[in-house]
A protein has these predicted regions:
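Extracytoplasmic electron-transfer domains, predominantly the class I c-type cytochrome c fold
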Residues: 46-94
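Electrostatic cytochrome c docking/interface patches
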Residues: 1-21
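Polytopic transmembrane helical bundles with strong interfacial aromatic enrichment
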Residues: 1-2, 60, 114-118
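Acidic helix-start/capping segments at beta-turn-to-alpha-helix junctions
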Residues: 35-50
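The canonical Cys-X-X-Cys-His
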Residues: 21-33, 84, 106
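Second-shell loop/turn segments in exported
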Residues: 11, 34, 93-97
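C-terminal capping alpha-helices of c-type cytochrome domains
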Residues: 82-83, 90-117
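Extracytoplasmic/secreted proteins, especially bacterial periplasmic and envelope-associated proteins
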Residues: 16, 20, 43, 47, ...
Length: 118
């Protein structure tokens, strides 16, 4: 597995939002994926690679401004509605499950950074 170079990042509203993003979302939505040991064992490796590739294609903060479509404006809404992070990711990455107070702060930070939200 590889991590392409970081081309550009968004202007984060705060260091806290950036830290939470990389803790909760960064493994699939950036080029700084931390590949777990089991990501080298088939068939799990295929699933993980597919999920990371799909996540990067949909929304990648390491390619900020370089993608034709960058769905940053959807990030807060998807987190609020429980669509992200996926349940199967949280099982293996308990740090991605935020307490309600931290989740509210993160949603505000995402909205301030990317726009959108409700």
């Amino acid at each position: 597995h590889t991590n392409p170079p970081v081309v550009a990042e968004p202007k984060w509203d705060s260091p806290q939002t950036k830290e939470m993003f990389y803790r909760v979302c960064g493994n699939c939505h950036s080029n700084t994926t931390t590949w777990p040991w089991y990501s080298s064992i088939a068939p799990v490796s295929w699933l993980i690679s597919h999920d990371v590739d799909e996540g990067r294609e949909h929304f990648n903060v390491s390619m900020w401004g370089a993608q034709k479509v960058n769905k940053g404006h959807d990030a807060a809404e998807e987190l609020r509605e429980g669509e992200m992070p996926p349940w199967f990711y949280v099982i293996g990455h308990p740090e991605a499950k935020l307490p309600d107070s931290e989740k509210a702060q993160f949603i505000q930070g995402l909205t301030a950074t990317f726009g959108g939200g409700k």
